[in-house]
């Protein structure tokens, strides 16, 4: 991939990925590295600027996170945000202490002096704070450029060395002029150009794939979802003669999904599709398994075995292509001070001894960028904007052991949910919608009889890239219709609940 324009060093903030997304939206290619990335790793990317993210630690604490001091000797512009701001102050000799006046939420930013970072933004603008420490004094060579009610050094800089620091979070939507501030840093302080777009990405990625693959053949695993469909379309665009597209029915799909996948690829994409029914194999291996991580790893391992068996039927198949996204990489790895959230079946769930080399064309981009790429490649809107569906399928939407009976119940409930959302016009307004079969029975009354049956949870969320999400504020009448239909039409369910958790702290999927 191309060199990074901006590198974000991640100190564990829940907003780190937003920084990269906001800059990419402005055409500036941005990557995230761990806070303790080696200097050689940073130099290899040849960035034009660095951003130090926020984080949960305190710079004066024993467990504080510090980057390699050499980052300050690279002669690159640096922007510190929240923890990153305090780290800059601390590194250059200022005092950072706990504050009695913590700032969480909205605050007003008052300008003190003119500067390139805040140029053409509004004095008195609303900014988003989230800190319990304060900078007591400025290091030598720095000047205050803005204050807030409780932060006398809310923004400061050393313009000569192009080091800037903000106590607030410009990357979050609540910061009124945040996008403009990040743009000022990237374009006017770092001299980045707006060259990042999906058209350029497709051209660069095609050249990389052609060079990597040569005369070998590629097995492309598809599920019918957005990610794998875009991968298949991209590969068909550049190595169609060497491409084998395989769809595996693992028995964990939604109602009629296998038929829809076949129609999508043959009729809409014009790609020959090999369909394999491996449902008995998958369900047999998942029998008795209740741990979600074990489910994911069994599914990942079994997928690879099926693909390897299929590859033996064809000559020269050396590569496996799949729709791994940047979000999958982030959630499946330790980034900065963050912990692994969960293994994705196509990241942490893959066996180490598999015989394929991997091709993951989308692993550097976010979900919203995948949709733009799909549009660039000519895919239809109904395919590009369909809701995400996880690789492990319904296995991670059934808590506890997976059985054919539970799958049947969940499929029926899921059909009703999607039907009601589409008929009411809400389906395309939401990011993702699905049912979760809880491993919980509850007492109910139907007619004059006591029931003791399954509870189903409805999960509907709004998001732009899947890194963060909030629950959808569906109308009560719609929720009532969904609940009534599921209870009346699906045997074995007597209770429906609605998940009102956001991400974070919850993930979108339950497992």
UniProtKB/Swiss-Prot annotation:
A cellular-component GO term for this protein: cytosol
Catalytic activity, as annotated: XMP + L-glutamine + ATP + H2O = GMP + L-glutamate + AMP + diphosphate + 2 H(+)
Pathway annotation: Purine metabolism; GMP biosynthesis; GMP from XMP (L-Gln route): step 1/1
Swiss-Prot/TrEMBL keywords: ATP-binding, Glutamine amidotransferase, GMP biosynthesis, Ligase, Nucleotide-binding, Purine biosynthesis
Domain GMPS ATP-PPase span(s) in chain numbering: 196-386
Catalytic machinery residues: 82, 169, 171
GO molecular function, one term: ATP binding
Domain of life: Bacteria
Quaternary organization: Homodimer.
Name recorded for this polypeptide: GMP synthase [glutamine-hydrolyzing]
Species: Campylobacter hominis (strain ATCC BAA-381 / DSM 21671 / CCUG 45161 / LMG 19568 / NCTC 13146 / CH001A)
Lineage: Bacteria, Pseudomonadati, Campylobacterota, Epsilonproteobacteria, Campylobacterales
